[in-house]
Amino acid sequence: MKTRIHVVQGDITKLAVDVIVNVTNPSLMGGGGVDGAIHRAAGPALLDACLKVRQQQGDCPTGHAVITLAGDLPAKAVVHTVGPVWRGGEQNEDQLLQDAYLNSLRLVAANSYTSVAFPAISTGVYGYPRAAAAEIAVKTVSEFITRHALPEQVYFVCYDEENAHLYERLLTQQGDE
């Protein structure tokens, strides 16, 4: 797994990967944080694609994921997932966060994409504690790629150095980095 999982500090919208994962709200209509940055970088085609998905299936439930084209992003596609809002840890948040990663990975693999970039799901305005979220992310992704050929490369994209070090430390502890 050492060569399959990477930590990158920077702007997820600039990565040349097959799929960028967008953390969105159930409406898929764009918002603040990473969601807003991805929508701005992708241009109006992404919002149009999200509107079509929403018209077909309605809101995207927490822990679920959908895939669309990537608009003006360097990626080929965007997987939109709804992470859980942190409510103290007693509202099934851990399982919902794991589901957000798993369902995103399943869409990447099902569409034969080889690389994916994840932001730190739910750690922004949704308030999930960073360390707990990183542990779930690393464990879930590591277990998935152990059992599946795709994606070949997974990137955890961290906005700041502190979060990047957190992911690097967890991967080192697992022997993955």
Curated annotation (Swiss-Prot):
Residue ranges of every copy of the Macro domain listed in the record: 1-175
Biological process annotations from GO: purine nucleoside metabolic process
SMART domains, per database record: A1pp
Protein's organism: Shigella dysenteriae serotype 1 (strain Sd197)
Gene name of the encoded protein: ymdB
Annotated catalysed reactions: 3''-O-acetyl-ADP-D-ribose + H2O = ADP-D-ribose + acetate + H(+); 2''-O-acetyl-ADP-D-ribose + H2O = ADP-D-ribose + acetate + H(+)
SUBUNIT field: Homodimer. Interacts with RNase III.
One of the Pfam families matching this protein, by short name: Macro
Protein's name according to its UniProt entry: O-acetyl-ADP-ribose deacetylase
Annotated catalytic residues: D35 (proton acceptor)
Keyword Hydrolase attached: yes
Superkingdom of the source species: Bacteria
Family membership noted in the UniProt record: Belongs to the MacroD-type family. YmdB subfamily.
UniProt xrefs under InterPro entries: Macro_dom (IPR002589), Macro_dom-like (IPR043472), O-Ac-ADP-ribose_deAcase (IPR024900)
